[in-house]
Each structure stands twice: as structure tokens, then as C-alpha cells.
Regions:
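Short, well-ordered beta-strand elements
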Residues: 30-40, 89-92, 111-114, 141-143, ...
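N-terminal lobe/hinge region of extracytoplasmic solute-binding protein
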Residues: 36-85, 179-180
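Bacterial N-terminal signal peptides that target proteins for export
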Residues: 2-13
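Sec-dependent signal peptide cleavage junction
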Residues: 22-32
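Aromatic- and charge-enriched surface segment that lines or borders ligand/interaction sites
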Residues: 79-121, 142
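Surface-exposed binding/hinge segments that line
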Residues: 126-167, 188-190
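Hydrophobic core
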Residues: 14-22
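Gly/Pro-rich hinge or "lid" segments in bacterial periplasmic/extracellular proteins
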Residues: 157-208, 212
């Protein structure tokens, strides 16, 4: 069990580091940038295989938590979290004032809907936790688990649990990509060619270094 948890933590940490590597804070001036990549996605549906990692690495997807460059667990779309003594109830406070890249507010209700979509559609979720239900209580999201999980915050740092806007038509998400909260948003996607992401004008966490990035 400990080895499985450690692997999940390392995987989530790597995903967070890849995202930060794509989005430097002060190296590049505004404009366009081209980055060569060796790993591509067949689809931008985040629940398919491990393609959520690509979505996060491209600076589009974000989750409730993340790992910093030193491997420390830090807040992202959640500002804080607590757990019950039995480890079966986890409460995450959702960051206020965050918008998706289309300008829609990221509400706790939409966070819940996004997570429930992932839980319903991905067969990888049981590798992380055994969920009973998710509730909204004001600005909080409450996870009710069937079994105790001491590493719930680490599990949610995995890109699989990125938060996307489920209030819009996502019928063509495989090509359009999810609408998320990261510094960039998808402009175009070619599974056998280039992918272009553009600056998210609603980004909540500081300046975005480039107008667009071609990958």
C-alpha cells in the first residue's frame, strides 16, 4: 500500500513540475513561442488514458492541489483542506475569484460537477480513492469516502482530477479540449501535428508570459 501511495505522489509531483516548466514566470516576453515535445495526445478528453497529463503539461489544466518544485504539497484551486479522524471525510475550500478561460466563474458546484464527470468516465479513479459521494457546503467541497485515505490531497494533485467547465457544450471536447483555469487555453489541436495554446486572459495567478505557444 505504501509503495502504491508513493508512486501516486511521485506521479502527481511530476505532472506539477511539467506544468511549471511550460509556464516560466519571467524568462520570456509577451509574444509567441514554439516548444518541441516528444509526447502527444490522441485526444484532449482528459479522462482518456493519461492524456490529462498532456493537458496539464501544456499549461491548460489545474487541480485542487499541486506539488511545487521542491515536491511539497501546496494549494492550487483549493486554498486549504482538512480531514476527519477516520480519514474518510475530506473537506477542501475552493479558491474564490477564479474564472475558467471562457470567463465563467469557477464555483464549488462546477468543481463538484467536474470531479463527478471524471469519477463517472475514468476507470483509473479507483486506483486513487474509493468515493461514496461529493457534497457542496458553501465554499467547500466535501469528499465522503468508503475507505480511509490519508493521501487524498496528494491523489487530487494528479492531472486526472483537473477542473473543467462542465456548464458548456463539451460534445467535441476530444478536439476542442476542456475549458480549464490554467494560464493557457486550447486554440487548435492536431493529433498528428501542432497544438496551439493561447493566453488565458482570465488567469488568476499572475502574468502569463506568452500570447501563444505552439507545441
Amino acid at each position: 500500500m505504501k509503495n502504491r501511495i508513493a508512486k501516486k505522489v511521485c506521479a502527481a509531483a511530476l505532472a506539477g513540475l511539467m506544468t511549471m516548466a511550460l509556464v516560466p514566470t519571467s524568462v520570456f516576453a509577451a509574444g509567441t513561442m514554439t516548444i518541441g515535445v516528444t509526447s502527444f495526445a490522441d485526444t484532449l478528453e482528459p479522462t482518456e488514458q493519461y492524456f490529462s497529463w498532456v493537458i496539464s503539461r501544456y499549461g491548460v489544466g489545474q487541480g485542487l492541489t499541486k506539488f511545487d518544485e521542491e515536491g511539497n504539497m501546496v494549494p492550487c484551486l483549493a486554498t486549504e483542506w482538512t480531514n476527519s479522524e477516520d480519514g474518510k471525510t475530506w473537506t477542501f475550500t475552493i479558491r474564490e475569484g477564479v474564472k475558467f478561460s471562457n470567463g465563467n466563474d469557477m464555483t464549488p458546484e462546477l468543481v463538484k460537477a467536474s470531479l463527478e464527470r471524471t469519477i463517472e468516465m475514468s476507470n483509473r479513479v479507483p486506483e486513487f480513492f474509493d468515493i461514496d459521494s461529493i457534497e457542496v457546503d458553501g465554499q467547500n467541497i466535501i469528499f465522503n469516502l468508503n475507505r480511509a485515505n490519508a493521501n487524498m490531497a496528494g491523489c487530487l494533485a494528479d492531472p486526472l482530477f483537473l477542473i473543467m467547465d462542465t456548464s458548456i457544450d463539451n460534445s467535441n471536447i476530444a478536439m476542442d479540449g476542456p475549458v480549464c483555469t490554467g494560464p493557457y487555453a486550447f486554440q487548435s489541436f492536431d493529433p498528428s501535428g501542432d497544438t496551439v495554446v493561447v493566453r488565458n486572459e482570465y488567469y488568476w495567478d499572475g502574468d502569463v508570459p506568452n500570447d501563444s505557444v505552439t507545441l
